[in-house]
Amino acid sequence: MIEGLSHMTFIVRDLERMTRILEGVFDAREVYASDTEQFSLSREKFFLIGDIWVAIMQGEKLAERSYNHIAFKIDDADFDRYAERVGKLGLDMRPPRPRVEGEGRSIYFYDDDNHMFELHTGTLTERLARKAKGLEAAQ
């Protein structure tokens, strides 16, 4: 039986740059760095973002960008503060996609290795309620 999400791993060219991104945007806390010891495929670091285990490993960046992404929940009151954090790190912030009212707001950005991240103010419950409301209006 699946118990939950174990971890996420991102392959990055520059471990130190990604460390600055994780700490600067997500308030990640570094809990392990392989440094010169290598027990895995390559040098790696582990972080906690809240209770989520995030691993980064040194390697080649993604060849191209896509809409595949990881979304982290943020409070709407913190939206502007997070947008400022992303901007200060010089990350490629993308325009938000069109949404209907009630679905929350999002900050989309790419890291230097073509991974897309989203900082989102909404929840699944809110999204489903909004979609149900839209279906009712259409009937």
From Swiss-Prot:
Superkingdom of the organism of origin: Bacteria
Q: Where in the cell is it found?
A: Cytoplasm
Presence of keyword DNA-binding: no
Q: Where is the active site?
A: E44 (proton acceptor)
Q: Which cofactor does it need?
A: Mn(2+)
Any one Gene Ontology MF annotation carried by this entry is:
metal ion binding
Q: Name one GO biological process term.
A: response to antibiotic
Amino-acid positions noted as binding Mn(2+) in the UniProt annotation, renumbered to this chain = H7, H69, E118
Any idea which UniProt keywords this protein has? Antibiotic resistance, Cytoplasm, Manganese, Metal-binding
Gene Ontology CC annotations of this record: cytoplasm
Boundaries of every VOC domain copy? 4-122
Q: Which Gene3D superfamilies does this UniProt record tie to the protein?
A: 2,3-Dihydroxybiphenyl 1,2-Dioxygenase, domain 1 (3.10.180.10)
**What PROSITE patterns does its record include?**
VOC
Q: What does this protein do?
A: Catalyzes the hydration of fosfomycin.
Fetch the NCBIfam families from UniProt.
Answer: FosX
Q: How does it assemble?
A: Homodimer.
Q: What is this protein called?
A: Fosfomycin resistance protein FosX
- Gene name, per UniProt, is fosX
